[in-house]
Amino acid sequence: MKLNALSTATHGSRSSPVKLWKFSTSFLLAASIIVSGQSWAAETAKPATDATKAANDALLKELPFDDKTSFDLAHKGFIAPLPAEPIKGEKGNMIWDPSKYGFIKEGEAAPDTTNPSLWRQSQLINISGLFEVTDGIYQVRNYDLSNMTIVEGKDGITIFDPLISQETAKAALDLYYKHRPKKPVVAVIYTHSHVDHYGGVRGVVDEADVKAGKVKIYAPLGFLEHAVAENVMAGTAMSRRASYMYGNLLPPDAKGQLGAGLGTTTSAGTVTLIPPTDIIKETGETHVIDGLTYEFMYAPGSEAPAEMLYYIKEKKALNAAEDSTHTLHNTYSLRGAKIRDPLAWSKYLNEALKLWGDDVQVMYAMHHWPVWGNKEVREQLSLQRDMYRYINDETLRLANKGYTMTEIAEQVKLPKKIATKFSNRGYYGSLNHNVKATYVLYLGWFIGNPATLWELPPADKAKRYVEMMGGADAVLKKAKEYYDKGDFRWVAEVVNHVVFAEPNNQAAKNMQADALEQLGYQAESGPWRNFYLTGAQELRNGVQQLPTPDTASPDTVKAMDLDLFFDFLAMRLKGPDVADKHITLNLDFTDLKQKYTLEMVNGVLNHTEGMQAKNADATVTLTRETLNNVMLKQTTLKDAESSGDIKIEGDKGKLEELMSYMDNFDFWFNIVTP
């Protein structure tokens, strides 16, 4: 999965004082507002309409709900439940409390405010605790968004993907140790570069042991770069949208958050990162780790930019990372991310079949529950291989017939054999938005119709639409008729124009909220449900300026290379304000023996490595450690200069002037209103 952003989010006015460097991890930032968000959650949530009940009932007839195989698999190997006590931080802050989802009870029928297929998926996800996958392989499930896997070797244990937070990872390891021998951790494997697969590493190993060679950390090529950089440039936007995607502002109940389809939600603890010691660079690499033979398959650009699958030969066990789970995954994440390639994804699954399909006996992933049996594993890999390929090929076939993105998304239906398998349902991704993403991957956002080439911005467009439709009252009156017919998609689309034309029109916002809410109740995708219901909540209640604490991760900051850091600064430069200004600074990092020139000119900030400008306004000498301390607000530029940690020759005011031109971003920007 998916959110490891850095941002400069602030809460409050857009004109708040400049904060030099403030970073946050988007998973963590979104999760950190869970508890405070509950206090204003949707007491105005409405019941399901007859149209919604009918839509959800129809799905009960379409899918084989009498097939309980998934429940048998999810219970298989159960050893112990999660402890009843929630995980809290040192200050009493809530980090993880799966008991909030106790209302999702196995065996109970879906409430009419929930899609029955998503309800079923949430029931399965809530089957939690410590499980044996096969002899010597164990998983802790539902102690975070992802699973933590533990493999017993000759001298110790190897941990796969230590969750999001240090606290949840430690609790997962403690649970394992209560029921298994307390062998030392001798290796960690990061399957890919999303934070829910590495953020808790300091909860299971000590970095001193890594540096001493007692613990090895394996990761795919490009892991560190992508773990830090994937979402840096759009961190605040991604984080805000993540609060919608994971439903962090919603109450967990039958009219609110059910989970995310991939897991329940994200933990809100301490995100950490220890750089890998061993890099997997290509398919076919074999490593003996603690007496077991690991065969690796490099799969970049599948579910993550840096990802790998691997097979433990002695166990005949395939770790599918996040490329084959019990859901149609995202080829585009609704929080915002670069689009993933479904064709490449399909080919990786085909390669896994080629490499290990004859021998594999169990497949487990870093979300959900395992699949046992050679025939069953091959079937899941084959069907999901064909699912992603079908999305790719059918999107392009229809595009080449002249259909547009939206038209294709309405037309494409998966073959029945694929679509009726619960593991291929769109609980996290969705067929609709994955098709749209595939179109954009190949053809971009423009559909070819020149009428859509230079559209008006939403508010300007909305005012004209409302005027031409006879005014807001006329639109709302007609929209109510469509609402009563159950045409919620159209109501949401047309009333959105009224909301953007007249943002203070509460009647319009209430009708829009009602329509979005019913769409949420019908949604099979967890993120779709969360987006719809969070949008409805903010339309009714407004955007609540909740605290967004500084969740800076020292490990992430230290892992940023200077090139990325300077790009990040350049993104924050208020270009229009400095278009006619010119500043040149030389930077000398004495510990790294690296020199840079920064030049602010024409409204941009360029940096050049290995160069010192002859006529620079000033030369700044410092160490990377000092830069880290300033970034983490452990010191200030002024204090660092006073202590001699930063030396400035030339115009000492130019560095401060440059930093005064950096923008800060309000986390709580509007989404469903202008």
From Swiss-Prot:
Does this UniProt record's set of keywords contain Cell inner membrane?
no
Which N-terminal residues, if any, form the signal peptide?
1-41
- Annotated binding of Zn(2+) 2, by residue: 196-197, 322, 367
The reaction(s) this protein catalyses:
a primary linear alkyl sulfate ester + H2O = a primary alcohol + sulfate + H(+)
Q: List the disulfide bonds.
A: none
Q: What class of enzyme is it?
A: hydrolase
CC terms in the record's Gene Ontology section: periplasmic space
Reproduce the free-text note on domains from the UniProt record: Contains three distinct domains: an N-terminal catalytic domain that contains a binuclear Zn(2+) cluster, a central dimerization domain and a C-terminal sterol carrier protein type 2 (SCP-2)-like fold domain.
Name by which UniProt lists this protein: Linear primary-alkylsulfatase
Q: Which organism is it from?
A: Pseudomonas sp
Gene it is expressed from: sdsAP
